[in-house]
Amino acid sequence: MPPNTVNKAAEIPPFEPIAIVGIGIRGPGGINSLTTLWDTLVERKSHCFPLAKDPRFQRRFNPDDFKALFDGIPDSENVLHANLFDETPGLDRTYFSLSEREAAGMDVQQKLLLHVAHEALEDAGYSGAEDGSAFDPSTFGVYVATATDEVIQDPRDYDTDIYHLVRTERAFLSGQICFHFGLRGPSSSVDTVCSGSITAINDACRALATGDCRAAIAGGVHVVTPVSGPISFYCIKRAGFLDRTGQCKPFLQNGTGYSRSEGCGLVVMKRLSDAIREGDRIHGVIRGLCIRSMASPKFISQPNGAFQSVALAQAVKISGVDPAAISFVEAHGPGTAKGDLAEVSSLCSVLAQHRAVDNPLTVGSLKGNVGHAEAASGTHSLAKVIAMFQRRRIPPQADFHPSRLNPTLQPFFDKHPIRIIENEEDWNASHRIAVVGNFGASGNAGFMVIEEGSTFQPLEGRDVPKVSSPLPFVISAKDQATLVKLIHLYIDWLKQPSTFLTPLSDISYAMTARRFIHPFMISVQADSHMDLVQKLQERPPMINGSANRTPREVAFCFSGQGGERVDPRDSTLYNFSASFTDAVDMCFRVAESENLVAEEDVAILELFALEFGLVEMWKSWGIKPVALAGHSFGEYVALVCAGVLTVRDALKLLGIRAALIRAMCLDVPGKMAAVRLPLSDVNKCLEQQKSTRVELACVNSDNSVTVAGTPEDLESFRQELLKWYPAASWHLLNNMTAAFHSRFVQPILADFTNACNEVKVHPSEMVVLSGLLGKMCPVGDAVLQQHDYLVRHCRETNRFGTAISDYQRQNVERETPQPDWLEIGSHSRIISFITPASDQLKLPSHGKSAGEGWMTALDALMRLYSAGHVVDFKDVHYDVNPSAHHTDLPLYPFQLEPHFYPARREVKASSTMLASTNEVQFCPRVPSTELAPLLLNHVMAGYTLCPATTHVALMMAAASTFASSSQQEGRLAYKLSKLKVIAGFTNTTDGWLQVRRQSSTSDLEIISNDDNKIHITARAEVCKEQDLLESLSLYASFILPFKSFKFLPSTDVLRKELAYSLFNHTVNYGPHGQVLDRVWIAEDGYQAWGYSTYPGGASTAEGVPSALRDFSPMLIESVCQLIGFLMNTSTNRKDGEAFVTDELGDCSIAISKLYETKYVEIYASYKMVDGGTAGLGNVFAFDDKGQLISAFRDVRMAKMKIYVLKRLIDRGRKPEQVVTTQHVASTEVEEDNVAHNDIDDKVISVLKAALRLSEIPLDKTLGELGLDSLTAIDVGVQLERLVPHRRDHLTIDPEGNLTSLLQLLRPTPLPKSLPITSSTKESKVETVDLATSPSLPIMPNGVPTTVNGVPKPNALPTVNGLHKPNGAPAANGVPTANGVPTADGTSTEPSQTLVANISPEMLQAISSNPEVIQYAPGRTPLLLIHDGGGTSFAYYSLGNLDRTVIGIHCPGLQEGKGIESVHHAANEYANIARQYLKQQCPGHSKVLIGGWSLGGTISMMMAALFPDLVAGVVTIDTTPPGVVGLTAQQAESVLLHPWSRTDGIHGLVRRQLQLNTRASFAHPEYKTIIRVTAVNVPVYVLCAIDPFRPSESLDLPKETYQWLLSFKQSDVAEVTWKELIGERLLGVQSVPGNHWTMFTPANVKATTEALKQGLDVIEARLNKMG
């Protein structure tokens, strides 16, 4: 070996200093932050408790599991101590977008890691932005340590499923963090037992040093779980590690082992250089780290002091730190005699040798406070040191006194300057440097040298913003309720005195640039801490959008001359924005260095520099334009931004042009004037007044122009103009240097041409809207490179407005969203010329004065951000506030749900199930006559309906009856679980209710006289009252803090009278039903407190059946009614809707306590679920002693229309419609349909089992039902075995519903049938004819009253589907009614008789606008517009279209008013469609539209007028314009001919027919608009194939009869529509029936198929177009 290579490997490479920039911590005793950890340390708290005697142990573990293992082991009771969490670690599954099944399948340690990782990332200021910084998610690593599993990896002992692998494989610990936070760097899960944390951190440091990642999150987790806990305790005890008396006792003489603990700790790290550069707050800096195996040669787990010394010396050497500079050691300190001895000896040998007496080494260990958290212990120790750095204090060692020191350690303390302190003291050191030790039982151990971070982040002497102006602030959350809570957290935090010490600029930086962005947000601007508090208290508008919404785009328009003059060097932006300042300085430097602009023309330089500076500022903030439009002078700056001209050349040309104007045009008497009048009108006047020689100088917009001429000519023109158009606006522009864009600049053109020829012009790099050409010029357009372009631009008319219109038109044609507009200049005059789309922004970027610069720009920035533009707030702050650093902010308020994955074996806890029996048991029947007083106190939707609390009382009484004699001893309490409402029970004279118990179970059902119909089901349990009260007490600590909002001024306080007046729209409560005396509703509307003295009153027994004398239903009502009140008085309920109890979830009541208390205080809270269609909440009640005595958890209330609820009660059906294996098909059952039903049954069975559902609702997507990625794989494997013919196609879409999945899996195309819903429990296969079967609800007129199982309003007549009494098909109209227009043209005002006989349900139905007819999210929604009769009821009979279908009634239907015109209706319905998309379909920006007859006409008009909204059109037998030559009176004759009824709804419909017919004929612009605009969306036409044969001759034109009687309508329609819209017509399809019979039962199937085919053809074309 060559000499120069010897021992090179022994050299220690330099250690890259690693900054800890974020931390998240969890520990026993409620430790959830550095603050709570510090409180534990300085107050000498111990969180150890004996397992056997603590209720927390009883809640989590099965005592019998411990008893079986430890029976006979000495000191087992003392050994079984631990430092456990107060509550099971929970999960906010909604925040992490997890299904219930997926959340249930996760290891509890994974759940804990997700939340602690979120807090560590928030603490570090990680926002998830892919910005190329060290925090870019693509280079972010994850390193996690653990030592235990929640479930032992033997699947025989557990209920294994698709998630078993996820639960048991430790790799998923780090993988879950990567997945949920989108981190794509290295990922690793390690296990070195107790030293896991420091090992994980070491791995992360090495990866950072080598460049494998640029940021990392690392640490450990440990939770003692019900499954693994007993056996792990037993094994550790047998190994001799557990202390015989309880808590860890580091360094003490009575220490015999350690006490187990739980915890989690994660730190976020970067290279120190990156952290300093990126403005991070640095908690500490890791200077050196060494991991070694230190096992004794004799025994793997026996510590070895000599080996530890080697590792510690190596860590110190790597750090480059003088050992004497290390002043504190956070020792591993397990409290074992050998372990403490080995560790202290190593510390003395490395750190205490040659140490001065006045520089003692302080040693401590937090295990005396929190125990040993095993794999998480290292991060616990690290967190303690960081807390010490922040406070510059050293906490006392728990339970320490010099007299208690372990005698074996005394020689080391006598010989070396080393100490343990018993009182808190200052940490006095010039540089605070510490060592953290962390050892593992496997022999793996490590030491870390860490230095305080303040050394690298000095707070003193920092720069502050140069001007005292407002700064931006943003708060966001995943949902509205959480956002409100977070706002209050910020308000409380900002009021704290310590927060006032934090610079406002740091707070702004942290809130905008260093936080996750969520869908619900607010943004404000404030210039002080208290101003920010005030702005937040004022409840700024909430933005509801998607965090992943499609980014919006912006276009810049540049101001011309003539506005307010602003010197950019005087602007507040010049002192605030570095990018603005640099750009402005560059312009002045270039101009002045070459004398490009004369002093007399400095205003031009100022305007140019201002606009160029604004552009550079916006670009530096991440706002980059997609198009540039300059108005006159402004086009020079636009060309510079587009790369056509350089700054120098643009200034040179502007300087030359200005000099030429001064030299040649000052004596030319040209002036300019602005005219507010349509361009066409101005052109007419110019044509008439040619003699005045007034010229059109600028086309600003369609309604604004600028003209030029001599003063005399302009005055003459003005006078003549105002004669013609008195309303025209005229404004003389006196501040212009010349009359540009007119003959008055002709003298300068020759010289200016020479100047332009000398300038080098480059291809454009951006879209430019040319004012010269009046059109959009794409990137690289050669016309902009012509040297005479700017010469012509100076002389010819500037067509700015025409260019804008051309750009907007091309965006429509390309189906490109219109951008927002930002004016670059000192005013907002130019953007006023732009006509925006409905939601387009038009914003100025600078005020009219220099002092308004920053305020205007900031306001525009925040409005752009709120609208969805991508703003790089890091760059914003770097530009305006480069000294800003990240700082502490309130953490996100998660809504946690506890859960441990259960073992399959039964838990042998104290039995609460009912006595065993092998027979079905019944309680005595309770007749409805006894229930009547209860029902009369509960009237819903006009019906006396049995309240759910009566069912609860019946079941509790039954549980008491069925309980065994041993269970009935002492004071009892009752639990009901899985409590579901199946159907309501209404008062009948001979009715009854009865509780039935299934054999060998605790399952109870309430049945009634209605053929033993089941009304409600639940599982019942009986338990000791004291046991129940102890378990309920756990919730009290979480609930009581919310009591504070009762005293806030923003809380609504309602007394009984007002409360029940608000509640009456849903439920009318009788005197005994009004159990709430007072209600406090929180500001967020999602939580409330109630107060009730009903339990203490004498009325609790009044009207109660004898069977329920010990279980008063109204007494139970007093503790749960609040949840229904809260939901039904919230903003989530609209008029005509109600929240109705669907499931009561789990109910626990100490009934005796409820009878004894004088009053109850009730707390209720809820959240919206299932896409806003239901509320899910909890309600708890406290007695007069403050004890929690009842709980209703997971109460689900479905939201529905009142009229639907009424019909459901009528039919005795459950509110939620669920699917069974029942199908609507042809009465002639074919073999393929039998095959379909067989496959359907199997598919539904697989889904039910996989999703753990008893039924599959049709109105929810599979994703909403819990079909996540892993479940989809599981289901897919099973389905491939069932349907091998579809293996190559099988992709299960979570966005689809059951119908779409069945269609995918059937072996042949979907048959001509539709799935309907049923509430029956039996699974039958039936085939039902759509038209004739009585199983499908049919109206008297033959139109189904349900579609896809969704009930439609009773007696829903459709004009085109009604039948006359003799069975002949009705015409599209109704006969004359009193007060209704007649066929002869006479008319009167609508009479009250028109609505007198219409049912409330029908009035409710026609007032619901728009109406959801079918619901199937995913594909583009279909909007169907009413026919000539004004209703959309015809569309209810359509079959399944596999998409959401929305119907629009005529808004004036109920008032007897028709449409004003086709044009007006198109505008009105477009607004309805936009609002529906925004509120209900945020993922869609367009709709497919269509309609029958008049509905098709309006649809075509909408397509012509609103191509940004309409994706395609399907017309249903709509007559092409100009084909049928009828007068309005003749049209009425045809439409009204077959009708003979005049009552009720028919009168309204008849009036609609007549009014709408006249409106259509009175406004013949329809054909012209269709032809001129050339409808630019795909169109598909359906035509009736049969002719119309009236029963008598009508006086009609010949061509009309030919159309009505011909079989060739489709041919004529195709030719006519083709002539009008050309290639956009994709097809014309004939449909059986004539115009008036297309939706009758005989023809509706064919109409459905044709409509569906047309929609598919349109979507295929749209997909092809991209």
From Swiss-Prot:
Region listing for Alpha/beta hydrolase superfamily-type thioesterase (TE) domain, in residue ranges: 1444-1529
Location of the Carrier domain: 1331-1395
Metabolic or biological pathway: Secondary metabolite biosynthesis
Segments of this protein annotated with the region Malonyl-CoA:ACP transacylase (MAT) domain: 555-863
Residue ranges of every copy of the PKS/mFAS DH domain listed in the record: 905-1206
Region C-terminal hotdog fold, annotated ranges: 1050-1206
InterPro entries: AB_hydrolase_1, AB_hydrolase_fold, Ac_transferase_dom_sf, ACP-like_sf, Acyl_transferase_dom, Acyl_Trfase/lysoPLipase, Ketoacyl_synth_C, Ketoacyl_synth_N
Enzyme class, spelled out: transferase
GO biological process: fatty acid biosynthetic process; secondary metabolite biosynthetic process
Active site: C194 (for beta-ketoacyl synthase activity), H332 (for beta-ketoacyl synthase activity), H372 (for beta-ketoacyl synthase activity), S632 (for acyl/malonyl transferase activity)
Region ranges (Product template (PT) domain): 935-1203
Catalytic activity: holo-[ACP] + 8 malonyl-CoA + 8 H(+) = atrochrysone carboxyl-[ACP] + 8 CO2 + 8 CoA + 2 H2O
SUPFAM superfamilies, sorted: ACP-like, alpha/beta-Hydrolases, FabD/lysophospholipase-like, Probable ACP-binding domain of malonyl-CoA ACP transacylase, Thiolase-like
O-(pantetheine 4'-phosphoryl)serine PTM positions: S1269
UniProt region (N-terminal hotdog fold), positions on chain: 905-1034
Gene Ontology terms for molecular function: fatty acid synthase activity
Segments for region (Proline-rich linker region): 1334-1397
Summary of the function given for this chain in its UniProt record: Non-reducing polyketide synthase that synthesizes the universal anthraquinone precursor atrochrysone carboxylic acid from malonyl-CoA. Produces a mixture of both 3R and 3S enantiomers with an excess of the 3S form. PKS4 catalyzes both hepta- and octaketide synthesis and also yields 6-hydroxymusizin, probably via carboxylating activity inherent to the KS domain.
Further remark: PKS4 is part of a new class of atrochrysone carboxylic acid synthases (ACAS) with unusual domain architecture and illustrates how the biosynthesis of bioactive natural metabolites evolvedi ndependently in various groups of life.
Stated name of the protein: Atrochrysone carboxylic acid synthase PKS4
